[in-house]
């Protein structure tokens, strides 16, 4: 009989095992489990795999930039100029159409805008990955009690020659390594 300490099934849970061995069995979720949930999700990982959606989005002059830092900054500016944040937070896409809808309407939540940024950076040959985090407005991140509900924001993380860079395209004013204040 499972007994959850929260209605959110992604939080730590303990269950009583009625098998022959008896006793308590832990069904605790870890941050690795959360990562897997995100990458398996149709609203996050599956969207990132849809490379064909963005293959013709970037102008050729941006694709041709050879310096990786300059290319990443140019892609950031491109997304900032052409897409608008609707002021809704999220670590993933929330519209039915996902990234395709963002490409058509040019408006999306923070997850959609920055997942598009990551997809464009990857399509241009950069080593971009999503970095999912919690904003101050979402509350303190409880690292001892992993829960996907704690996460409400995603930014692009790019490794350029061993140097980490963060990119956030939700604000028209951010630059590399600057995340919009929550």
In which residue ranges do the predicted regions lie?
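Hydrophobic alpha-helical scaffolding
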Residues: 24, 61, 65, 103-107, ...
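Short acidic (Asp/Glu) and glycine-rich catalytic loops that position anionic groups and cofactors
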Residues: 51-57, 94-98, 136-137
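Secretory-pathway-linked proteins and extracytosolic
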Residues: 1-76, 80-87
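Contiguous, well-ordered alpha-helical segments that form the cores/surfaces of helical PPI scaffolds
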Residues: 76-77, 101-104, 114-119
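Short, conserved helix/loop micro-motifs enriched in His/Cys and acidic residues
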Residues: 87-107
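Hydrophobic/aromatic-rich core segments of domains that either
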Residues: 96, 112-182
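Secondary-structure transition/capping motifs at alpha-helix termini
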Residues: 64-69, 81-87, 105-106, 118-129, ...
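Phosphate/nucleotide-binding catalytic core
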Residues: 28-30, 91-94, 115
């Amino acid at each position: 009989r499972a007994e959850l300490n929260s209605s959110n099934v992604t939080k730590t849970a303990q269950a009583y095992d009625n098998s022959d061995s008896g006793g308590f069995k832990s069904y605790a979720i870890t941050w690795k489990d959360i990562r897997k949930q995100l990458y398996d999700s149709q609203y996050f990982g599956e969207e990132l795999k849809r490379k064909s959606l963005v293959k013709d989005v970037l102008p050729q002059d941006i694709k041709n930039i050879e310096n990786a830092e300059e290319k990443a900054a140019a892609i950031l500016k491109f997304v900032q100029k052409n897409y608008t944040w609707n002021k809704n937070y999220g670590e993933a896409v929330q519209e039915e159409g996902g990234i395709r809808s963002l490409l058509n309407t040019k408006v999306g939540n923070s997850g959609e805008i920055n997942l598009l940024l990551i997809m464009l950076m990857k399509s241009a040959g950069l080593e971009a990955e999503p970095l999912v985090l919690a904003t101050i407005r979402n509350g303190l991140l409880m690292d001892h009690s992993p829960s996907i509900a704690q996460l409400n924001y995603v930014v692009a993380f790019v490794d350029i020659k061993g140097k980490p860079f963060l990119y956030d395209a939700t604000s028209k004013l951010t630059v590399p390594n600057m995340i919009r204040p929550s």
